[in-house]
């Protein structure tokens, strides 16, 4: 996606592009949060930038006769001129229970309605695992009960905390719930069903391995003869 002048250093282009994506994502979160916004993707098309927004309820995001999404397109074009002409395509999230942002927003809404934090967290955790996740962790930080702030963690399945595995295999969402006692930070981390962990071994039948070895040996012999 070419959006910057030719004289701008490459590393600065990457930084600026990252900042633009973050700001755009935050803006769409504000505008499409009620529709269950779960993230976006940028695509460069001829003479324009296409934004694919993934939401839980597309009808709410689009609005009556497309008015809401047209308004968002106009505001994005005005606020982010580097994107050029903007078109937004709204797509439905295939599995909202596996999107940490959607889950965090639902959990925050439950806390704001006065549902006990343990009941709300365990309910969210159960729905995540029932959707097929390999693992999940929910962290609630703030005034959960009483005047003193505290942190509670809820986990199930395989969870990677930090380092490269944590960054590569876990996806994260964060939302802040505003309750009467005070603000509560809601962090949801999910390991998707399709993640292949490095410590997971596949034991294959001997006959299958033997067939592959024979095929490789045959190819090696053919190459040797050809040389």
Curated annotation (Swiss-Prot):
Pfam families cross-referenced by the UniProt entry: KH_2, Ribosomal_S3_C
Gene Ontology BP annotations: translation
GO molecular function: rRNA binding; structural constituent of ribosome
Location of the region described as Disordered in the Swiss-Prot/TrEMBL record: 207-227
Domain KH type-2: 24-94
Annotated keywords: Ribonucleoprotein, Ribosomal protein, RNA-binding, rRNA-binding
Cellular component, GO, one term: cytosolic small ribosomal subunit
Highest taxon, organism lineage: Archaea
InterPro entries: KH_dom-like_a/b (IPR015946), KH_dom_type_2 (IPR004044), KH_sf_prok-type (IPR009019), Ribosomal_S3_C_sf (IPR036419), Ribosomal_uS3_arc (IPR027488), Ribosomal_uS3_C (IPR001351), Ribosomal_uS3_euk/arc (IPR005703)
Role played: Binds the lower part of the 30S subunit head.
PANTHER family the UniProt entry points to: 30S/40S RIBOSOMAL PROTEIN S3, SMALL RIBOSOMAL SUBUNIT PROTEIN US3
HAMAP family, A to Z: Ribosomal_uS3_A
Protein family membership: Belongs to the universal ribosomal protein uS3 family.
Subunit-level organization: Part of the 30S ribosomal subunit.
Protein name (record): Small ribosomal subunit protein uS3
Gene designation: rps3
């Amino acid at each position: 996606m070419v959006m910057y002048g030719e004289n701008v250093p490459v590393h600065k282009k990457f930084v600026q592009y990252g900042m633009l994506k973050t700001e755009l994502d935050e803006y769409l979160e504000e505008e499409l949060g009620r529709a269950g916004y779960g993230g976006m993707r940028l695509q460069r098309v001829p003479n324009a930038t296409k934004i694919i927004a993934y939401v839980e309820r597309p009808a709410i995001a689009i609005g009556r006769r497309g008015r809401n999404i047209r308004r968002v397109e106009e505001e994005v074009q005005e606020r982010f001129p580097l994107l050029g002409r903007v078109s937004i395509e709204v797509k439905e999230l295939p599995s909202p229970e596996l999107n940490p942002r959607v889950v965090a927003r639902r959990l925050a809404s439950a806390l704001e309605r006065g549902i006990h934090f343990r009941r709300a967290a365990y309910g969210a955790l159960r729905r995540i695992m029932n959707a097929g996740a390999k693992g999940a962790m929910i962290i609630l930080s703030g005034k959960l009960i009483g005047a003193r702030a505290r942190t509670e963690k809820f986990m199930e399945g395989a969870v990677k905390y930090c380092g490269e595995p944590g960054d590569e295999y876990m996806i994260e969402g964060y939302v802040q719930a505003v309750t009467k006692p005070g603000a509560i930070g809601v962090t949801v981390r999910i390991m998707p069903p399709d993640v292949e962990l490095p410590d997971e071994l596949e034991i294959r039948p001997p006959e299958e391995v033997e067939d592959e070895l024979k095929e490789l040996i045959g190819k090696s012999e053919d190459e040797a003869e050809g040389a």
